[in-house]
Amino acid sequence: AGAIFEMGEELVWASQPAPMMLFHGDADANVPYNVIRESGVGFFGSKYIAGQLRAMNSPYYFYSVENASHVIATAPMDGNRDAIDAFLSKLVVDKEPLMIETDETTIGAPEVRKNFTLAEYIASNFL
């Protein structure tokens, strides 16, 4: 799970980005899953970044986990090594022009809160 902080309300790429692999839970209270804009700045999460990469026809792999918190930030190193290897082999080494999206949902899992304010993101990281 990660995000890009941008001084401005839109994420602007100076050039075509390198292939990216993104893992993110849609209930992350530490890092925005999509985007939050406030006072002329933006905090752009994995879902938003993946959408921009798709619009630019730039290779990426986005693994989204429904109802998952920031725990997804470390989980891929244990549970997704095959996907990481495939990403590195196909998109980085072989330069295959692929856009891959995987949505993981646990059947019967309860819905959790998914919308957070900028103040809540700051508090969860620094207070």
Kindly label every feature range from the protein language model:
Residues 1-16:
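Primarily recognizes the serine-hydrolase "nucleophile elbow" in alpha/beta-hydrolase
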Residues 14-20, 56-59:
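Short, proline-enriched alpha-helix->beta-strand connector loops that line the catalytic pocket
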Residues 21-24, 28:
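Short beta-strand/loop motif that positions the catalytic acidic residue
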Residues 29-45, 72-75:
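Conserved alpha/beta-hydrolase "acid-adjacent" motif
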Residues 54-127:
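C-terminal catalytic histidine-bearing segment of alpha/beta-hydrolase fold enzymes
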